[in-house]
Design a protein with these regions (language model features):
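N-terminal accessory segments
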Residues: 2-272
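Active-site and channel-lining beta-strand-loop segments
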Residues: 272-287
Length: 287
């Protein structure tokens, strides 16, 4: 980055909060506002996707009312700090503070595991509705729906995002957690290669990684956007191969870990994860 660019960044940064505050009130349509889609519009969306619509709630909600908690409350208590379990819950974040919401008057909407506080269970920042995406067409249908209705859109794979961008109060969720496609190709050829090239793989919303071996051709594993590192490691091991990944096995392999640099145990030998993908498949939308 040039020095001029750095200086411009520091001069612009102080005015950003003021600009953002002016725009937030009318930025996106949120749940509970008159602009929110009605039941018929959500029914129409449901007919275009492969799975029923999600209605996420904070996982602690099964412990309420305190006078008659659900039988699932014991499961929540037993797995509350389990990263794999939390990634399986559409309404759970890895950092529970991102499930809460603080209003301008400093009141809080949250659902606490400690039911002795006497505070009612609230939705907090957990999206009230979403799409359980299993394919590229599911994702496209969800994005187009959000665009049509000007909804605040969030995407969650495992909920590890350190900035809490996997969730937002009153938003519309795309949950990619079940897009678990895994393919091993010992002679990988990227899509779009010359027609005479063999073994071309036509991806479906995936990320393709090198897997390491000593040969004169490219060997690769294709991972769906919902694959977690424990899935990827188990799959690569069955092929007798290794893949550069993160130390936390519950983190998504094709998400923020790659985009944020991707440091892992094999990085000193094979480099950062951001340099390993060789053929990401992206979806195009008309904005």
């Amino acid at each position: 980055m040039k020095l001029q660019s750095i200086l411009q960044f520091f001069f612009v940064l102080p005015i950003l909060p003021a600009v953002a505050n002016k725009a937030t009130s009318a930025c996106r349509c949120l749940y509970g506002q008159p602009c929110w889609p009605d039941e018929n519009e959500f029914t129409a969306l449901a007919s275009r996707i492969s799975q029923p619509l999600l209605h996420p709630v904070p996982p602690e909600s099964v412990c309420y009312p305190t006078s008659a908690p659900s039988g699932d409350c014991s499961i929540v208590i037993a797995n509350y700090t389990n990263g794999d379990w939390r990634s399986d819950q559409p309404g759970a974040m890895q950092n529970t503070n991102f499930e809460t919401f603080i209003f301008h008057n400093d009141t809080i909407s949250a659902c606490y595991l400690n039911t002795t506080l006497g505070i009612p269970c609230g939705q907090g920042s957990v999206p009230p509705v979403g799409v359980d995406a299993r394919s590229a067409s599911d994702v496209q249908a969800a994005v187009n729906f959000a665009k049509q209705h000007n909804l605040k859109l969030v995407v969650k794979g495992t909920g590890h995002d350190f900035l809490g961008r996997s969730t937002a109060r009153g938003s519309f969720l795309i949950w990619t957690h079940h897009m678990k496609k895994t393919v091993y190709n010992p002679n990988f050829v990227p899509e779009g290669a010359p027609v005479t090239t063999k073994n071309t793989f036509n991806g479906d919303f995936v990320l393709v990684f090198f897997v390491f071996q000593v040969t004169d051709h490219i060997s690769a594993v294709t991972l769906g956007t919902g694959v977690q590192w424990h899935d990827a490691y188990d799959f690569a091991q069955k092929q007798g191969r290794s893949v550069v990944g993160g130390a936390a096995a519950s983190v998504g392999a094709a998400g923020g870990w790659v985009m944020g640099g991707g440091h892992g145990p094999l990085s000193p030998m094979f480099g950062l994860g951001t340099f390993v993908p060789i053929c990401p498949t992206l979806l195009k939308f008309m904005i």
